[in-house]
Amino acid sequence: MTLWTIKIGTSLLRGNKEFSTNKIIETYCGFIAESKAKGDQVIIVSSGAVGLGCNRLGLKVRPNDLNSLQAAAAVGQGYLMSLYESAMKKYGYNVAQILLTRSDFESKRCFKNASLTIKKLLDWKVLPIINENDSIANEELRYGDNDTLSALVSTAISADQLVLLTDIDKLYSSDPKFDKDAKPITDVHSSNEIIQIQSNSNESNNWGTGGIKTKLTAAQIATKNGITVHLADGREPKILKDILKGSRGGTVFHPNPKPIGTMKSWLAHALYPQGTLHVDDGAYNAIQNKGASLLIVGIINIDGDFAKNQPVKIVNLEGIEIAKGISSISSESIRRFINNRIKSTQYPVVVHRDVLVLSSELLI
């Protein structure tokens, strides 16, 4: 049994001269039903609500302001779900809508609840359809792309494979639309390779919010958690059938043999730091090389305001980020200590090692 996450991009659901949006979804769902029938589990992360909403409203150009985008998403999301429901009903499967925002992942409790809900739906042989909650999320709560969301969901449910269906056939060394010497990249084996790949392609067309960079970010998140990622051209729907049967996508991002684990992935990728802790060389060495927690005495400066148990990033004297974690002490209390520099034989822990992830752990 394989647990699949399939991300379907906006550009694939707009329809074209050959296939309507309805036909495209029906085709994908047919392949998914085949996979489920042989015992696999599948979830879909589907874009398209804004694009379909614009289409139904007769808008020829995608709006730029957030309120218009949210209104279009509200129109399109219901229609999008009706297409999936109709397509899967033919094969005897129910579908479930799950709308998420960044805040759902920033709370450890909500993060766990979301994963448990998805797993229960899978136990019931339901097909979860996940999308960002575009209709209510403000700029601070939005991921802005479903590539990152698909990787975080895959991590939360411990998926085996993530398929990113898009409108390119594979990853290239540069944008082949503008560079005739662009070389195809069929395999990527580490996060370092992902970081080193320089893509000069346009970030998106005007109907989508994801681009090559967001797909690289998604691949980095997923592979660090032991998940194989396929980047494939969804304009040829049959490629999904082939991948679900064991073939490969145009580019395969191979999983890290030593996953960092759900907790560290949550700390590194799901949380938005509310402040920055500047540490001295002693604290840097203790954190980086000795596996220690961050004590308050090692903090020399602080940026931002945050409450107890909120996420922070930790930087060295050069301002380079070295870690992220959860602060057990508020910014107000830390500033009070810095201003007074109270001497003690036992200083409190600000970020415990159990809720800290090193930046270097993400570069392997």
UniProtKB/Swiss-Prot annotation:
Keyword ATP-binding attributed: yes
For this UniProt record, the keywords arranged alphabetically read as follows: Amino-acid biosynthesis, ATP-binding, Cytoplasm, Kinase, Nucleotide-binding, Proline biosynthesis, Transferase
- Gene3D superfamilies listed in its UniProt record: Acetylglutamate kinase-like (3.40.1160.10), PUA domain (2.30.130.10)
Binding positions for ATP per the UniProt entry: 7, 166-167, 209-215
Question: Which subcellular locations apply to this protein?
Answer: Cytoplasm
Q: Which example biological process does GO assign this protein? A: L-proline biosynthetic process
Which InterPro entries does the record associate with it? AceGlu_kinase-like_sf, Asp/Glu/Uridylate_kinase, G5K_ProB, Glu/AcGlu_kinase, Glu_5kinase, Glu_5kinase/COase_Synthase, Glutamate_5-kinase_CS, PUA
Q: Where is the PUA domain?
A: 274-349
Q: What does this protein do?
A: Catalyzes the transfer of a phosphate group to glutamate to form L-glutamate 5-phosphate.
Q: What is this protein called?
A: Glutamate 5-kinase
Organism this protein belongs to: Prochlorococcus marinus (strain SARG / CCMP1375 / SS120)
Its ancestry begins with: Bacteria, Bacillati, Cyanobacteriota, Cyanophyceae, Synechococcales
- Please state the gene responsible for encoding this protein: proB
